[in-house]
Amino acid sequence: MNLIFTPPSLEDLIRLLKAWRFWVFGALVGAALGAAVYFIFPPEYRAKATVNVDFNFEQAFPENTDRQDFYYLERESRKMVELAWSDDVLAQLNAPVEELRGGKLNLSQPAEAGWHFYADDKDPQQAEVLASAWANAFAEKAQAEIEAGNLNEFIKLEVTQSANLPKERSIPLANYLLAGASGFLLLAVFVLLFIKPK
């Protein structure tokens, strides 16, 4: 078979399965290429700071219902996400706001409990500084909003991780290995199925 839109025959599929040595070799070559790209053009470092957020449902709604809990959690979480990305908070990070909002910072929050503040940078120390500053600025701003009555008074925040932060590459090596191996094998399938041997 050498036409792209022609369905493969049983013989073509058998030929693919018989070439197991080629698949193993192709996977190794693809993974090696992925590793080479990773080390030649490494992704940025990522640091993670954590702020523990407790909405205290029991105190906010002594006779609560699930619907009240959900609405309260969704409303207050949305307000706090807006705070995290606000100009006042980002201005304290000593970096261009456009750059920070353009992918250098990422927020992962499960509504209640640990809110994770991620910062990416080529310099691992700078990534740590950004993540730590962002988490602390958020906690201070949120506390000020609680005291001003703009957030529920029962919300409690605590910066639990802002020093000696874990730093790792923003994209793990395993992703590069998998992408390299998969890409090489897909190319190999195309070659074996659609290029007729002489």
Language-model-derived ranges and their functions:
Residues M1-K198:
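Hydrophobic and amphipathic membrane-targeting/association helices
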